[in-house]
Amino acid sequence: MAGIKSTMDLVMERAARMGMATPDEMRHEERLKKGMQSTAEYLNGTKPSLAAILGEHEPSEHASIRKGMLTSLLRNLFLPRDEEGTKRIERAVRGIIELNKDTPDIAALCQELQTITSQYGQHRTQLYDQLKEQMRMQIEQMLMRKGMKADTSKIDPTMEPQFKEQWTRLEMDLDGQYGQALEQFKAQLKDWTGV
C-alpha cells in the first residue's frame, strides 16, 4: 500500500515537474494527458477504437499518447463488484490488447487477468449467497425457538447488523486474496508495456 499514491500526490508531483519542465517535457505531459482523456472516452463507449484515436495524431506524438492510454487502461483494472465494473474491465483489456497487438504474450496475460476477475466475481457472489442463506436459517431457527412461525419469504438477512459485519470481513479477505493476484498481473503488464 505504501507504493500507492493519492491523486493529490500525483497532481502535486506533476505541478512541481511543470514548474521546472522543459518545453519538450511539457509537450510530453500534454500528450500523456491527451492519451488518458481519449481512453476515458473509449472506456465510456463514446470512441470505438484506441488505434483509430492514435491514428488521428502525428506519428511523433504516438509514443506519449499511447503511454497515457496504457496508464489509464491499467488504472481501470480492478476487482469488479457488479456487471458494469466487469464490462469496464473487459473494455480496458480489449484496449490494452489493441495497443499491443504485436505482442501475443500481453493478450495471454490479459486473458489470465480476466479469468482472475471473473473468478473473483463468481466467488464473491457465492460467498454472499452462502452467508445470506446461513443467516436466514439462523433467524428462522431463532424464531422457531421463540415459538414463532417464520415466513421465510419475508426474512431479509442482509438487513441484520451481524450479516453486514460478517460480509465486510469476508469481502475484505476475498479482496485481499484476489487483489494481490490482480496487482501482480498489473505489475507484469506495466513492465511489458513500458508504462
Identify the meaning behind each predicted range.
Residues 36-130:
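Long amphipathic alpha-helical segments with strong coiled-coil/leucine-zipper propensity
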Residues 16-27, 50, 54, 81, ...:
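Generic alpha-helix signal with a bias toward terminal, lower-confidence helices
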Residues 136-195:
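Long amphipathic all-alpha helical oligomerization modules
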Residues 1-62:
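Leu/Val/Ala/Ile-rich N-terminal alpha-helices, chiefly Sec-type signal peptides and the beginnings
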Residues 29-37, 41, 60-64, 68, ...:
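Long, C-terminal folded domains that constitute the functional core of proteins
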Residues 15, 19-22, 100, 124, ...:
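Conserved NTP-handling cores and scaffolds of large molecular machines
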Residues 13-14, 68, 95, 103-106, ...:
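Amphipathic, alpha-helical segments enriched in basic
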Residues 5, 33-34, 47, 67, ...:
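Context-gated lysine
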